[in-house]
Amino acid sequence: MFDEPIISSFVFTNEETTQTFHHQWFSQGQLHECATCYSSIDADEPPSQHWLRGGEASQGLHLTKQQQAVMDIIEARQIETFFFCDESSKDKLEHFMGETCARGIPELLRWMFQNNTVAVEFNLACYVNAMDQVLIFQSGSLRADHHYDVDESVGVVYEMLMQRIENYLNCSSEYGMAECSITRLKVQVKRIRVEADGQSADSSVFALPLQLQEEEGLTATTGCSTSEAELASLRSAYLKHFRECNGYFPPNMRVNLYGLQQCKTTKELYVVPYHISETLQQLPNKNFLILNNIMGQFQRLHELSTPVNSIERDQTSSPLKDLHCRRCRTQFSRRSKLHIHQKLRCGQDFSVDSMHADIVEIYEQCLPISRSVFQHACYGITKPKTMMRKGQFVPIECDWRSESSVKVQHGPCVVISNAQHNSPCKFY
């Protein structure tokens, strides 16, 4: 995610036989050409073909058969707790946690937006090995109401956790960040769902992404007077022509439709034309934004108060005003990040705890999730944790036939223990 303010332009260039779309942005006085937002179609094709051929299809969540099988187990067993583990135990504090919060945890939360899930509520806990003990730093709970909010939500939680870890270490010991490590990250997730047959009946449960909620013109106003009957008719017409005509809408469909795309480079959301109809008589066309779920399936039409062309920001726009939290004075480059920070109440609900040096936490019979997806090992927790004292249990990489005073059941385990050991997976 780019943290500095950016001013984007989304440019359509018409030539004799082709229409080209590309994304540019200005940052720190320089013009950047985006390498990921580019499309070219025939000049006589509707703009929807830009997104149907490449952008829109590629932005949905695509799971392999193995990943879908894992997701089915998560569903069936109602797994809500996950651990990311750095089994090498060689990386310093920032590396494992930063990498996992940038890629692994956001991807896991996006998985959770399947099967009629409209929002997820989550918190993170990191186990910091410092001062010959394990310190547990836990965030407050945060609700992400749209799958496009996941990256920024996790990013803000990560920054706030890192700041609290650093402040705690500076105040409590001679240890610095460089002398500490993290080998375990816990994610607790609660999914908020809607009934499958109630999706079209109550579209208010499908929120706009945070990056769009503050944009002038993108939120419907009291002047948007489309009735429920008109919306239902338009929704049916849109779905019919989308399925049967692959985005080629008839000229007599007197509305302007827009789609939503996310730049893979800057993670910025932008609204793009999908179907623009000529205006007849003196009544302007109504404008609607097409909202899809994470699988690319239609959710609802969101009415816009003005056409998108009139609200698009360009390089001549006035600079973004300074954004800061009135309570703690923290500054932000995006209004959406400030909103997330305020939902977390400036970190008021964050906490720190510690594990006794002789205590070991064991999570047995965990569900392994593909490392190729998350870089580091990830496990779904299927059973309550077991608290033991050292020396009482069989180690993870043991001969399961060996005798022990405590029997650990077969299957992958997650172990959390004192930092004096080089690897939490290979001791006793």
UniProtKB/Swiss-Prot annotation:
Zinc finger (C3H1-type): 325-346
UniProtKB keywords: Developmental protein, DNA-binding, Metal-binding, Zinc, Zinc-finger
InterPro entries: Znf_C2H2_type
GO molecular function terms attached to this record: DNA binding; zinc ion binding
Name recorded for this polypeptide: Protein terminus
